[in-house]
């Protein structure tokens, strides 16, 4: 089985994965998956606190998967080598914790899932490069091209889509405050052409079912 949730921000919002709040995990095993839709935050500085929470996740009755958001330390993340899993590329961060690389269609628990991490930080002017902000938060042209190639190979049909930010038209329904950028425009193109059952995303610190096709997640943990 697969569950998805929103940003964990290291240990700040990880409490939603406790057995008290996420009771379904008692019936799960390491063959089941919990996927975080970006801003995982537990590959940041290698501190003792970070290692504690990685160990805590490893001890859960599920395997943790995550896509990157805009608040990740990409310098450290990209030091982890890519390895083959789910028919694509992942980074093994710790036992039973895997980062899902951008722009892939993966087969997880028999479901075809398109994953595309990344988002634009709208408070960049208050952040410091390589300390609290990384240029790699936004996918490169190469990563977007890889995503298109992956979708081409799958005839533009998947079961689910997991991203950190939303397509432009969906984002605009959440708030007028959010600006257009190359990634939300790219995702808008994908939205128009892709056949999918449902699209889940994080980033906006909100739990809301937008419509029959889109759900934004933050604290909720839901099964797909």
Language model features with spans:
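Short, charged N-terminal beta->alpha structural module
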Residues: 1-18, 120-131
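Beta-strand-turn-beta hairpins that frame and shape the catalytic cleft
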Residues: 1-3, 104-115, 160, 211-215
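Structural motif
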Residues: 4, 33-37, 160-164, 200
């Amino acid at each position: 089985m697969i569950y998805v949730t929103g940003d964990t921000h290291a240990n700040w919002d990880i409490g939603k994965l406790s057995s008290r709040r996420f009771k379904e995990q008692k019936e799960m095993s390491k063959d089941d998956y919990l996927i975080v839709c970006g801003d995982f935050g537990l590959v940041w500085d290698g501190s003792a606190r970070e290692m504690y929470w990685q160990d805590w996740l490893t001890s859960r009755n599920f395997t943790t998967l995550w896509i990157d958001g805009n608040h990740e330390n990409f310098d450290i993340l990209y030091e982890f080598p890519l390895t083959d899993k789910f028919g694509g590329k992942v980074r093994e961060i710790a036992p039973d914790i895997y980062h899902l690389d951008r722009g892939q269609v993966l087969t997880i628990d028999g479901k075809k899932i398109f994953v595309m991490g990344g988002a634009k930080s709208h408070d960049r002017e208050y952040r410091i490069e390589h300390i609290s902000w990384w240029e790699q938060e936004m996918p490169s042209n190469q990563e977007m091209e890889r995503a298109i190639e992956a979708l081409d190979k799958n005839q533009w049909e998947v079961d689910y889509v997991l991203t950190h930010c939303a397509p432009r038209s969906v984002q605009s329904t959440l708030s007028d405050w959010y600006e257009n950028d190359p990634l939300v425009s790219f995702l808008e193109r994908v939205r128009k052409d892709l056949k999918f059952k449902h699209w889940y995303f994080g980033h906006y610190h909100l739990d809301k079912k937008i419509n029959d096709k889109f759900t934004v997640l933050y604290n909720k943990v839901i099964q797909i």
